[in-house]
């Protein structure tokens, strides 16, 4: 399996076709929601997808910035309940944090998927609303400033630097907790 992250202008025609086909199959056909699936946001997005060895897309989302706000949208996992949705969302969040230095991400989630996003750290920020006949909620993800797993976080760099300065590590135990 491969994870691919590309801006719109770097996608091949085959990649773009595969992305649009999956999105139409899920959002228009499966959800019976006849609306314009292809939009101008595609041209300003990073397209993030997981594909198998046969180039079949298993999960997809797009990450984009409007004004000063980053958004993730068009999240798809197909087939469902295999962990692909979690994997693609974690990849998108990590890419946003480490490469684009994003602290906050907004999504408009279908309400049936709200718990899925909450497990990833998103919190609900709106009352339910209708979008194209489907109930959604707005949600927000805020990067945890003291994320111990983020070695690029400035606080973690300070700890590493302090640890290198001292021969006796007992002197810095208070900094590690």
Features from the language model and the residues they span:
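Conserved acetyl-CoA-binding loop-helix of GNAT-fold acetyltransferases
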Residues: 77, 82-94
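Conserved GNAT acetyl-CoA-binding A-motif
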Residues: 96-110
